UniProtKB/Swiss-Prot annotation:
Family indicated by similarity: Belongs to the UPF0761 family.
Membrane-spanning residues: 41-61, 104-124, 139-159, 185-205, 217-237, 249-269
Protein name: UPF0761 membrane protein VS_0126
Record-linked Pfam families: Virul_fac_BrkB
Keywords: Cell inner membrane, Cell membrane, Membrane, Transmembrane, Transmembrane helix
Lipid bilayer topology: Multi-pass membrane protein
Localization in the cell: Cell inner membrane
Biased composition (Polar residues): 281-290
NCBIfam families for the chain: PRK01637.1, yihY_not_rbn
């Protein structure tokens, strides 16, 4: 067997060394940023805000006659593809909560909208902390961005679902080749949707310029972790259903709690990957870093941005 040329060996060695240094730097960075703690914090905020968010989304969709039935389609799609196993129980609980909000007064509806804005605001603060962003957006700009997410987001989602339904109804799909390709895309749709959702989050939320390649890499990691966690979590709660023996009819609640926590952990891990890729000078081979200097540099960065730590507010 022919040996690899020296130049290829050098490239392979350099790539392996770079991967090890990057992984070490990433783990140190994640430990310093306490991604597990922040994931729990965001999960708590999400659980308080999930019903207001769903209510606002469905209310906006229902105000457009063309999207009259899209809200139900979106709910079914999300539960089927993004909530592992026991989706029916979680779906039923959420629908019951949302239905109860219909009995609220105008003042209560305003507070629901504020709760939804708070969730988006906390996501913004946590992600900007990961990127060590110290310069805050102006209040007017932040509010405009949050308002756009709450209003245009549901409309764009509804338009996407409506367009998919229209394409599905076309005679073009009767062609075997086209139909097979379309079905393949549909099967991969959860992964594709996750990737672009993470990509938009990592590219647009931080108040600094993010390279497309870095955001794409972090999004790919997060999307793959999300798909793996869905399968792993589903296997666990179906093969080891001890939670049902303990919680009985309330089993859907801890399932939702744990799943939301895992989701945010994955979001933050993907964000850390994206941010770390943009700090190549901190972990590249040319710096000949050692583990202790990793900690020192990350700690120094963190201290410079402690004022933006979402938990300190």
């Amino acid at each position: 067997m022919n040996e690899l040329p020296g130049s290829y060996k050098l490239k392979i060695k350099k790539a392996a060394t770079g991967s090890i240094q990057f992984s070490r730097y990433l783990l140190t960075r994640m430990t310093h940023d306490r991604v597990n703690v922040n994931a729990g914090y965001l999960a708590y905020i999400t659980l308080l805000s999930i019903v207001p968010m769903l209510t606002v989304l469905l209310s906006i969709l229902s105000s457009f006659s063309v999207f009259a039935d899209v809200g139900l389609v979106i709910q079914n799609f999300v539960i089927t593809n993004f909530v592992p196993a026991s989706g029916d129980a979680v779906h039923g609980a959420l629908l019951e909560f949302v239905a109860n909000t219909g009995k609220m007064t105008a003042v209560g509806s305003v507070f629901l909208f504020i709760a939804a804005l708070m969730l988006i605001s906390n996501i913004d603060k946590n992600l900007n902390y990961i990127w060590r962003v110290t310069e805050k957006r102006r209040a007017v700009l932040s509010f405009s961005m949050y308002w756009m997410v709450l209003t245009l987001g549901p409309i764009l989602i509804g338009a996407s679902i409506a367009a998919t339904s229209y394409v599905t109804s076309l005679n073009l799909l009767q062609n075997e080749v086209v139909s097979s390709a379309f079905n393949t895309v549909i099967r991969k749709l959860p992964l594709i949707t996750s990737f672009f959702a993470f990509f938009g989050l990592y590219l647009l939320v931080p108040n600094k310029k993010i390279h497309f390649s870095h955001a794409a890499a972090g999004s790919l990691v997060a999307a793959l972790l999300f798909e793996l966690s869905k399968k792993g979590f589903a296997a666990y709660i179906t093969q080891f259903p001890s939670y049902q023996l303990i919680y009985g009819a309330l089993a859907a609640i801890p399932i939702l709690f744990v799943w939301v926590y895992l989701c945010w952990l994955i979001v933050l891990v993907g964000a850390e990957v994206t941010a770390a890729l943009g700090e190549q000078e901190q972990w590249s081979d040319s710096q000949e870093m050692v583990h202790s200097s990793d900690k020192d540099k990350i700690t120094e960065q963190g201290n410079n941005s402690d004022s933006t730590d979402p938990e300190s507010k």
